Amino acid sequence: MRQRRSVVAVSVKPKGFKLGHKQGSMSTTSPPPSSPDGNVSTSGPSAIKLSKNWELPQRLKPGRKPKSKRGDASANNDGSSKIKKVQTSNQKDQMTTKDHENEGAKGHEGKSDDEGNGSGDENGVDSVEKRRRQNRDAQRAYRERRTTRIQVLEEKVEMLHNLVDDWQRKYKLLESEFSDTKENLQKSIALNNELQKALPLIVNTPFQQQPENPPDNPISILEMVENFKPIGAVSLKKGKLKAHC
């Protein structure tokens, strides 16, 4: 014969949730034994009691994604805390060893200082004199560089002044040429206007033809008067005179 399986219905009534930094332990109670009839009394107290302290996640920085699992985060935190503890312990050990070494070195330095005070004073004086000499040399070199630089700049300035003077002379020469050409242009324009006005008069005047073979050396009227010589008297016959009368 088959055995009947008993089914137990459990009612859960959680308590109020509390917020805190530590997770609380879950307190559970064992369920009551199942009744042979399969009926459960719901009027009695709750069989399971849950109590859990919820922990709020830390506020994330902008641009970072939240972690998917809290278990991984807690494990990482535990591991990082362990690593930090180991590092701090190692640092403490290193500091103690360094302190011991420094104390030993100070002891040796004190002995060596006591032994070489005289030589140290001499070395200090030499180092001061050497430093002063180096400073004097550096200042002298700086002054020389400054004077050479000033000379170079003065030469450049003088060259630029000469160049400016040349361009000014060229400008004045071109300006005078421009003014002369402008005057000549105005004169030629005025002459052209006069010729245009006289053109219709020239066209309407009759054309006079000049002789084809003009004399090579034309004689002026004054020369003709000066070179004039009177002719001698001519005797006329009486019969001719009467006829004329």
Swiss-Prot record:
CDD domains: bZIP_YAP
Residue ranges, compositional bias (Polar residues): 74-94
SMART domains: BRLZ
Signal peptide positions (record): none
Principal localisation: nucleus
Pfam families in alphabetical order: bZIP_1, Hap4_Hap_bind
Keyword Nucleus tagged: yes
Entry's Gene Ontology molecular function annotations: DNA-binding transcription factor activity; sequence-specific DNA binding; transcription cis-regulatory region binding
Keyword tags: Activator, DNA-binding, Nucleus, Transcription, Transcription regulation
PROSITE patterns noted in UniProt: BZIP_BASIC (PS00036)
A GO CC term attached to the entry: nucleus
GO biological process, one term: positive regulation of transcription by RNA polymerase II
Region of interest called Disordered, as start-end residue ranges on this chain: 1-144
Region (Basic motif): 130-149
Stretches assigned to the bZIP domain: 125-188
Cellular compartments annotated: Nucleus
Sequence ranges of Basic and acidic residues compositional bias: 95-114, 135-144
InterPro entries hit by this protein: AP-1-like, bZIP, bZIP_sf, Hap4_TF_heteromerisation
Annotated region (Leucine-zipper), positions in chain: 153-181
Keyword hit for RNA-binding: no
PANTHER family linked to this entry: AP-1-LIKE TRANSCRIPTION FACTOR YAP1-RELATED (PTHR40621:SF6), TRANSCRIPTION FACTOR KAPC-RELATED (PTHR40621)
Subunit structure, as described in the record: Homodimer.
Family: Belongs to the bZIP family. YAP subfamily.
Function noted in UniProt: Probable transcription activator linked to cell cycle that induces transcription activation of genes in the environmental stress response and metabolism control pathways, like the closely related YAP5.
Other information: One of 8 closely related fungi-specific YAP proteins (YAP1 to YAP8), which all seem to be transcription activators of the environmental stress response and metabolism control pathways and to have similar but not identical DNA binding specificities.
Protein name, UniProt field: AP-1-like transcription factor YAP7
